[in-house]
């Protein structure tokens, strides 16, 4: 069934169920642009280029019992300067947002395909570069976090992002990420960020790679005419590689 038919049936089901329980209609949209002029000699890590794009994301959904939401949206991306021919798509990329969200005073949980901005954690660019965060802006899986209402900026979260399905054409890929922070008195705090990227094989190549990153840190936020945040931490990285895992 096409995405268009799925969305039409979903909206019809929401409209039909409006009389069954108290519901609030949610309508919104986000618009972002990104300009990144990368002028340098090409190397093994990246290439010299200019990234210039715009993204528009309209959303619609329903809320019931003040804690439950079901959201449908479309992520529309256009790379400036990309000329689409007669047989090419109108936009550079079009992808869905479909997720359920539970939201209470302390706890939030998302399941489905949702925006990366739902994350609370402080993940350095060693985890996600700024371009990765923009162009890979959706998570497909689950997110859960707990946020303290008694201590400011105190939370813990975990998410699973499923990025690839096991098949002959693609590898099985998923990423488990987690972060936490605890704020002490007078602005002192400590926390961590964690990522495990599982890059498994396809049906034609059974090699498996696991990339682990752990970043514990501590810091001090204070005000002296301006807001300051002094932070120090460590980054631990571990790469695990298994060849022909299916035969072992």
Regions found by a protein language model. Give the residues of each.
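Residues that define the transmembrane beta-barrel architecture of outer-membrane proteins
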Residues: 48-56, 90-96, 136-142, 170-176, ...
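Surface-exposed coil loops of outer-membrane beta-barrel proteins
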Residues: 40, 108-181, 196-198
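Surface-exposed strand-loop-strand hairpins of Gram-negative outer-membrane beta-barrel proteins
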Residues: 34-55, 83-86
């Amino acid at each position: 069934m096409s995405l268009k038919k799925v969305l039409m049936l979903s909206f019809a089901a929401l409209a039909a169920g409006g009389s069954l329980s108290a519901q609030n209609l949610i309508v919104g949209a986000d618009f972002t642009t990104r300009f990144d002029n990368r002028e340098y000699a090409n190397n093994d890590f990246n290439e010299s280029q200019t990234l210039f794009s715009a993204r528009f994301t309209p959303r619609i959904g329903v809320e019931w019992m003040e804690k439950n939401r079901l959201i449908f949206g479309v992520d529309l991306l256009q790379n400036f300067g990309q000329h689409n021919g007669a047989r090419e798509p109108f936009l550079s990329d079009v992808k869905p947002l479909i997720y359920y969200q539970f939201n209470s005073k302390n706890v939030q949980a998302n399941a489905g395909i949702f925006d990366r901005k739902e994350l609370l954690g402080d993940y350095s660019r060693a985890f996600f570069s700024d371009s990765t965060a923009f162009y890979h802006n959706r998570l497909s899986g689950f997110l859960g976090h707990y946020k303290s209402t008694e201590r400011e900026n105190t939370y813990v979260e975990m998410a699973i992002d499923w990025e690839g399905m096991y098949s002959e054409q693609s590898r099985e890929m998923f990423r488990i990420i987690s972060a936490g922070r605890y704020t002490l008195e007078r602005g002192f705090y400590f926390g961590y960020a964690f990522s495990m990227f599982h890059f498994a094989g396809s049906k034609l190549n059974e090699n498996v790679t696991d990339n682990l990153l752990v970043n514990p840190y501590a810091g001090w936020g204070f005000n002296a005419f301006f807001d300051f945040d002094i932070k120090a931490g460590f980054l631990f990285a571990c790469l695990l590689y298994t060849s022909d895992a299916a035969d072992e």
